[in-house]
């Protein structure tokens, strides 16, 4: 299902429980919590965006919250009892939890940062698209069988002979660095020189 919901409190409400599966939800509350249930909350294989006023939770359940294989964006600072193999954005700060597979298309917008920590994996499967317009920090694993587009590259290390390679999309970017000359002087019978530690270029005295 694809749902756009807006209300004062809450935008999306489950009296006894709330289950979201294989869905795209955009819920905005103008007065309080965006998505709320008095019982248990379950989110699976879904994309959920919850927008609430400042200092209010975006998503809340009075009992347990279980999230699996989903992409969650909330304006609140909440954490959840059980969240597995999902992406969680609290405001502009996002993280990959476990082993996440992108469903359809996902975009990191210009003001957001997504951290792929060591031991976690972000997979872009065949026909899926992942776009980075913000900042993606890759300390874990990227598996790309689909399409990655970066308007803002990150990671990699440039040298005097090799531009930096983006750790997300594997494309070169930026400029070459200046030579890194050794502090040690070398010489023969005619000249003295310093040598670049990378490409061995000579800088004569």
Where are these regions (language model features)?
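Tandem-repeat architecture and repeat-register "anchor" residues
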Residues: 1, 15, 21-23, 38, ...
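Beta-strand-rich solenoid/repeat architectures in extracellular/passenger domains
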Residues: 1-8, 19-31, 43-56, 71-82, ...
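Tandem-repeat/low-complexity and Cys-motif detector
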Residues: 7-15, 32-40, 55-63, 79-82, ...
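Extracellular low-complexity Ser/Thr/Asn/Gly-rich intrinsically disordered segments
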Residues: 14, 134-138
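Long terminal segments
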Residues: 67, 78-92
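Thrombospondin type-1
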Residues: 150-205
């Amino acid at each position: 299902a694809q749902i756009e919901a807006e209300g004062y409190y809450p935008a999306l409400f489950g009296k006894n429980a709330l289950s979201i599966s294989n869905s795209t939800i955009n819920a905005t509350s103008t007065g309080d919590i965006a998505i709320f249930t008095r019982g248990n909350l379950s989110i699976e294989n879904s994309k959920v965006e919850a927008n609430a006023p400042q200092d209010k939770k975006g998503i809340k359940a009075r009992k347990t919250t279980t999230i699996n294989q989903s992409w969650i964006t909330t304006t609140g600072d909440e954490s959840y009892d059980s969240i597995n193999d999902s992406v969680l954005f609290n405001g502009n700060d996002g993280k990959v939890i476990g082993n996440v597979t992108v469903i359809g298309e996902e975009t990191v917008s210009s003001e957001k940062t997504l951290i792929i920590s060591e031991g976690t994996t972000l997979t872009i499967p065949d026909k899926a698209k992942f776009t980075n317009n913000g900042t993606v920090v890759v300390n874990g694993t990227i598996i790309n069988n689909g399409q990655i587009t970066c308007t803002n590259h990150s990671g990699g290390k440039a040298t005097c002979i090799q531009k930096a390679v983006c750790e997300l999309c594997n494309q070169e970017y930026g400029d070459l660095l200046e030579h890194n000359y050794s502090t040690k002087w070398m010489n023969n019978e005619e000249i003295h020189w310093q040598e670049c530690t990378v490409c061995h270029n000579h800088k004569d005295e």
